[in-house]
Amino acid sequence: MALSPILVPLLLIPIFLGSVSAISPLKTDTLKPGQQLRDWEQLISAGEAFTLRFFTPRESSTFLLGSGAGLRYICIWSQTDPVWVGNPTEPVSDSSGSLSIDTNGALKITRANASPIMVSPHLSLAGNVSATLLDSGNFVIRDAGRGGGGGPGRILWQSFDHPTNILLPGMKIGFNLKTKKEISVTSWTSNQVPTPGAFRLGLDPSGANQLLVWRHGEIYWSSGILTNNGSSQLALELSRRYNIDYEFKFHSDKRMNYFSYSVKKTKGSVSSSWFLDTLGQITVTTSFRSNTCAGGTSESSGPCKKYLKSSSAICIAEKPTACRKGTEYFEPRRGYMMDNAYYGDGLSSGISDCHGSCWRNCSCIAFQSLPRGRCQYWGKGSTFVPYDNFNGGLVLIVYVLDSEK
């Protein structure tokens, strides 16, 4: 069931906490055959808008491998957040990883005592290849011998064709009719674990000019019909607030059907990102900077905001059940539950799956999303105990049904 869009201001923008080793820039935006981007190094785009480097999410360093260790991912970063992950399902287990490109155009991460991790495939095109990080946030593989005219070369592969959980200006989501491949944005399992989660943002396959969010293959949210250029509600609102031209583009030809967007400001620089979070919400963040001022806005879309009585409540829409109307909600609480705990069977895709399982069980009143795709639940008769003094700075968040607090 497609649900109408709801736009509400956010006071908090998601923060991706992680540990990053001491970083040494390579003083370049390009990686060539024979060069390596080692664990402690980074590429910097020409205008210093984006960097490419390894990092360890906090959750993996805290829970998965023990204190002082962690899983390493190759990521493109904006000023504050990762916007693309090259190896979301196959991290490096230590700091031995290094990124390189071979003469056939294959990006790969080599590591100690394990086979290489392929970031891009072999393109079977020997030539003058290189990989460059652009100021758009796109990481492109080019063959200079095929560009002609002394230009930078034809693009053979680009990270924009393989988005993770963020849509940047110029990225295209839709359908490649030639390769029969769909390009979409997929949520992470958690804010610190980049493996694919429960939600996916893409273009409506029916041909309508609208965006859909799916939850495990079922339509969860719809943007409603959008228009090209800047005449859509969201585009007009952002333009009015910050004097920014915000435009949507729907395009269809024999090769590809896609949606993309762009932003620009008359004076100064502007950046934007659409973030699909672990709850299936889209947070649209736009910021600008000039010689005299800086500012920004953040808007989120979600199907359940109108039901929530608390700004901190978890927003995941569920279908009504025999015991729940669909307007109840779980709220995060710092502390722990007493008695009647049990664990779910099998692995989950993060907090959304834990939420759904607890929702469908009429005796479940609280849950917790654990590392490694596990869920813990508490049944009726359990008691919540507030507590805020966890050792080592660990904060235990339990999601408690509003009627049970």
Where are these regions (language model features)?
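Beta-rich ligand-binding surfaces for carbohydrates and other polyanions
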Residues: A2-K405
